[in-house]
UniProtKB/Swiss-Prot annotation:
Taxonomic source organism: Candida albicans (strain SC5314 / ATCC MYA-2876) (Yeast)
Cofactor: Zn(2+)
EC number from the UniProt entry: 4.2.1.109
Reaction catalysed by this enzyme: 5-(methylsulfanyl)-D-ribulose 1-phosphate = 5-methylsulfanyl-2,3-dioxopentyl phosphate + H2O
Name of the protein in its database record: Methylthioribulose-1-phosphate dehydratase
Secretion signal span: none
Gene name of the record: MDE1
Subcellular location(s) per record: Cytoplasm
Length: 270
C-alpha cells in the first residue's frame, strides 16, 4: 500500500465525475486506487514534483504482477503532461506478443477532447526490462542528476560509487546459471560498489533499445541504465521496489555530482 498523493495538479472530484463517461467495466476497474493505471498517475505527479518528468518527458510503465494476468502492461502515452495524466489515458499491452489490447483513443471523445494519443516512445525499452529482467515496473526519468553524472563521466561506459549508506536500498543481484535468470540474493551493503552502465543517446528514443538490451545483459548486477545527456531507466520486481530504487539511485547521483565538484573520489580505496 502507498501513502496517498497530496499533490494538487488534478481536481479529484472532477476526475471522479469524468469516470461516469466510461463503460461500467472501466468505471469498476479504475475505482481501485491500487490499479496500475491509477498508480502510474500517482507516481507521475510525484515525479513531476521532483522535476523528473517535466515538459511531457519521461515515462512509467507497470506490469500487473498482482493481477489475474501478470502479462498485462500499462504504459503512459507519449507527449502528455505527466502531472495531469488520467487512468484512462494508458495503453494496455499484453506480453509476450506485445499485443495492444486498449488505447486511450478508444475512450469517449468527451474525455480525450479528440486528442490523438501515441504509444510511448519508451515502449520497446520498457518491454526489454520485462522480458530480460522479469521486472514488475520500469521508470524513465529525465533527472538532471542523471544527466550531469553522464557528463562528468563523458568518456566512461559506467558510473560507480561506493561506501555510501544509501546503497543499502538497492538489490544485490546475481545470474543463476541453472535457471538462466537474474535473481535477487539480498540487499547491497555499505562496502559494496554500485555500478550502473552508461549508453549513448540517440535522436529517437526507440533507437536506444539495442544498447539498453546489451547493457542489461552485460551488467547483471544493475537495476538501472544511464543514457548520456538524456536520463535514466530504472526497474524493479514491483512498482514500489522500482520507486525505491529510482529514489535511492537519484540520491546517489546527486551526491556524486557534489562529491565530484568537491574533488572527493566516488569509489573509496580500501
Amino acid at each position: 500500500m502507498s501513502a496517498p498523493c497530496h499533490c494538487k495538479h488534478v481536481d479529484d472530484s472532477s476526475s471522479n465525475d469524468k469516470l461516469s463517461a466510461l463503460s461500467p467495466e472501466l468505471q469498476q476497474e479504475f475505482k481501485d486506487p491500487n490499479h496500475p493505471a491509477n498508480l502510474i498517475c500517482e507516481l507521475c505527479r510525484l515525479f513531476y514534483d521532483n522535476n523528473w518528468v517535466t515538459g511531457t518527458g519521461g515515462g512509467i510503465s507497470i506490469r500487473d504482477v498482482d493481477g489475474p494476468n501478470p502479462n498485462l502492461v500499462y504504459i503512459a502515452p507519449s507527449g502528455v503532461q505527466k502531472e495531469r495524466i488520467q487512468p484512462w489515458e494508458m495503453f494496455l499491452v499484453e506480453l509476450p506478443d506485445e499485443k495492444i489490447l486498449r488505447t486511450p483513443n478508444d475512450i469517449p471523445k468527451e474525455l480525450t477532447k479528440s486528442y490523438k494519443y501515441k504509444p510511448s516512445a519508451c515502449t520497446p525499452l520498457f518491454i526489454s526490462c520485462y522480458t530480460l529482467r522479469d521486472a514488475g515496473a520500469c521508470i524513465h526519468t529525465h533527472s538532471q542528476h542523471a544527466v550531469m553524472v553522464t557528463l562528468f563521466f563523458e568518456n566512461e561506459k559506467e558510473f560507480a560509487i561506493s561506501h555510501i549508506e544509501q546503497i543499502k536500498a538497492l538489490p544485490k543481484l546475481k545470474y543463476n546459471d541453472e535457471t538462466g535468470k537474474i535473481e535477487k540474493i539480498g540487499s547491497m551493503e555499505y562496502y559494496d560498489k554500485l555500478v550502473i552502465p552508461i549508453i549513448e543517446n540517440t535522436p529517437h528514443e526507440e533507437d536506444l533499445t539495442d544498447s539498453l538490451q546489451e547493457a542489461i545483459k552485460n551488467y547483471p548486477g544493475a537495476s538501472a541504465v544511464l543514457v548520456r545527456r538524456h536520463g535514466i531507466y530504472v526497474w524493479g520486481e514491483t512498482v514500489w521496489k522500482a520507486k525505491v530504487y529510482n529514489e535511492a539511485i537519484d540520491y546517489l547521483l546527486e551526491l556524486a555530482v557534489k562529491m565530484k565538484l568537491a574533488g572527493i573520489p566516488l569509489v573509496k580505496q580500501e
